[in-house]
Regions:
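Buried hydrophobic residues that stabilize the cores of well-folded domains
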Residues: 2-242
Length: 242
């Protein structure tokens, strides 16, 4: 298990622990996603349960693997992922979500460098070695995210890093390597600014005995640019690996 991650023909890492639960807790409530895999370690289904303001909402996702194609369906809606050499190159979403008709581009290290949403709009990723250091949106000069590191790493990967591609996407949370986003470098801070707010997110981590991330605490400080008012929110992510 200490070897370099090894991939099978589907592009899935097979010699590391699998994510079986992701729990997000903040002051408003909790979101829990549970993941189920086949005997080859490929995600086949996931259930997300959100408990906010006294109400519970559950979604079930089903994942179907084909030749160079993966379909993730939920409540009759489906995202289709097209793959080449174990990497997602295109997505289409029948519900017109974030990943409707999006092209994925990678660098020579199979890291994601661009999500092209349409002819004009894209999100670009900048890497320094194994570290994702910057994300920038073409449709806003203001909207840039910069990530800072101090050398912390983990076994496996940090699942929430793939949320910059799309959040609540169980396939990508379970298999971020399919989108070139299997990050084991752990950011200390993510700084971002848009037209309204300046945001600083500080991260601390705990680990299980094998070095996988067990919990991640995110403290977000938002500062309004027009009046310098600040507010702080804390979110705790917990991960269960098997």
């Amino acid at each position: 298990d200490d070897d370099e991650p090894s991939k099978n023909d589907d592009g899935v890492i097979t010699n590391q622990k699998l994510l079986v639960e992701l729990r997000v807790t903040d002051e408003d409530g909790v979101s829990i996603t549970e993941y189920s895999y086949d005997s080859n370690g490929k995600l086949v289904s996931a259930t997300n349960t959100e408990q906010y303001d006294g109400s519970t909402h559950t979604s079930t996702y089903t994942v179907t693997w084909g030749a160079n194609k993966i379909i993730e369906s939920r409540n009759g809606e489906a995202i289709t992922y097209t793959l080449e050499n174990g990497l997602i190159t295109h997505t289409s979403d029948c519900d017109g979500g974030d990943l409707d008709n999006t092209d994925f581009t990678y660098n020579a290290n199979n890291q994601l460098v661009k999500l092209q949403y349409d002819e004009e709009d894209y999100l670009s990723y900048t890497w320094q070695g194994e570290k994702l250091t910057k994300m920038a949106w073409s449709f806003s000069d203001e909207d840039i995210h910069e990530l800072s590191y101090s050398g912390k790493t983990c076994k496996g990967y940090l699942p929430i890093m793939v949320w910059s591609v799309d959040d609540l996407c169980p396939l990508l949370e379970a298999h971020p390597e399919l989108a070139g986003m299997r990050c084991n470098q752990l950011p200390d801070k993510i700084y971002s600014k848009d037209e309204i707010d300046e945001t600083t997110e500080q991260y601390t981590y705990t680990f299980d005995k094998d070095g996988y991330v067990e919990s991640c605490t995110e403290v977000s400080t938002y500062k309004r640019l027009d009046n310098n008012e600040t507010r702080t929110e804390t979110t705790i992510y917990t991960f269960t690996w098997e």
